[in-house]
Amino acid sequence: MKISQAVGNACTVPASNVETHNNNPSRESKIIYLPGTNCEIKSQALLSAFTSYRVGGAAELYVAPRNIEALQASLKYAQEHNLRVTTLGAGSNLLVSDRGISGLVIATRHLRYNRFDHQTGQVTVAAGESIPSLAWEIAKLGWQGFEWAVGIPGTVGGAVVMNAGAHNSCIADILVSAQVLSPDGTIETLTPEELGYGYRTSLLQGSNRVVTQATFQLQPGFDPAYITATTREHKQMRLTTQPYNFPSCGSVFRNPKPYSAGWLIEQSGLKGYQIGGAQVAHLHANFIVNRGGAKANDIFCLIRHIQQEVQERWSILLEPEVKMLGEFQAA
């Protein structure tokens, strides 16, 4: 069994960013009840509603456990039936193929809780908690250190896996530990060092473990009004520099130091370039937006075109930050 934490190609998309899932199950819808839980596995669940691009086909099987026991039962079911597992958070850094995904998709969106330790300034948060909501809650307490994250449209689990960041800060800077679940049901607590963090990456990517919760170290004791105002400034900065009026996945490409991917794309004359319903955003060139009616393959082909143009002009192959799941067909 292989587990992909979410967050195909020919030619230009690096293989490390592609998980090939050939979804060719029976079209008959069914529900499988997991013994000893209030959890059910559904077949042929459309994933477009669960991704920020609002595109993508169906999951062969889909489950959204509400507690660790149900999550363990879901992994056990996948292991017993030799199913590939894909973990889905907010779907904000994910491109799902129009053909869908085979195996079992486990959504963590119902794993929700947080515990604040007001003496130490630490907060322990479940994998399904929203990063922006957490940022506002922390700000209202007057705790410093999470203001930068208010504009990241994802969940705690996904942020831990990809080492999400903004404004020269990232998850690795404040993470104390992450609790992860293995397919055999064992739970480990790992430090940032054990997670092997790098720029937008960790050892959890492509591994067979699922993040269940994370503990962050913040700095309490500040004026809540001040921290809230700072958080609002970060949010406003995102709103004025990034497109929020159309569905997107956030930044599409990693920044190839010392350049910014957005600058390279803009200097290549690609702002506004469109394939089908997918367009390079006018406001920020490292965003691809769904202008309406886009297919996942439109977005994939636009990613490929951007890579080709930038490589021809700058001899730099942009590496996607977005995770692509399923089979795609290049134009």
UniProtKB/Swiss-Prot annotation:
GO annotations of cellular component type:
cytosol
List the gene name: murB
Its lineage reads:
Bacteria, Bacillati, Cyanobacteriota, Cyanophyceae, Nostocales
User: Which HAMAP family does the entry mention?
Assistant: MurB
What role is this protein assigned? Cell wall formation.
Q: Which residues form the active site?
A: 200, 251, 321
Name of the protein described by the UniProt record? UDP-N-acetylenolpyruvoylglucosamine reductase
The portions of this protein that span the membrane are: none
> What is the species listed in this Swiss-Prot or TrEMBL entry?
Trichormus variabilis (strain ATCC 29413 / PCC 7937)
**What is an example of a Pfam family matching this protein?**
MurB_C
Q: Which NCBIfam families match?
A: murB, PRK13905.1
GO molecular function term, any single one? UDP-N-acetylmuramate dehydrogenase activity
Top-rank taxon of the source lineage equals Bacteria
- From which residue to which does the signal peptide run? none
Pathway this chain belongs to: Cell wall biogenesis; peptidoglycan biosynthesis
Q: Does the keyword Cytoplasm apply?
A: yes
| Gene Ontology biological process terms from the UniProt entry | cell division; cell wall organization; peptidoglycan biosynthetic process; regulation of cell shape
| Keywords, in A-Z order | Cell cycle, Cell division, Cell shape, Cell wall biogenesis/degradation, Cytoplasm, FAD, Flavoprotein, NADP, Oxidoreductase, Peptidoglycan synthesis
Cellular location of this protein?
Cytoplasm
> What chemistry does it catalyse, as a reaction equation?
UDP-N-acetyl-alpha-D-muramate + NADP(+) = UDP-N-acetyl-3-O-(1-carboxyvinyl)-alpha-D-glucosamine + NADPH + H(+)
Q: Identify which cofactors the protein needs according to its UniProt entry.
A: FAD
Which Gene3D superfamilies does the UniProt entry name for this protein? 3.30.465.10, UDP-N-acetylenolpyruvoylglucosamine reductase, C-terminal domain, Uridine Diphospho-n-acetylenolpyruvylglucosamine Reductase, domain 2
Alphabetical list of PROSITE patterns matching this protein: FAD_PCMH
Query: InterPro entries recorded for this chain?
Result: FAD-bd_PCMH, FAD-bd_PCMH-like_sf, FAD-bd_PCMH_sub1, FAD-bd_PCMH_sub2, MurB, MurB_C, MurB_C_sf, Oxid_FAD_bind_N
EC number(s) given by UniProt = 1.3.1.98
Which residue intervals define the domain FAD-binding PCMH-type in the entry? Answer: 54-221
Q: Which family does it belong to?
A: Belongs to the MurB family.
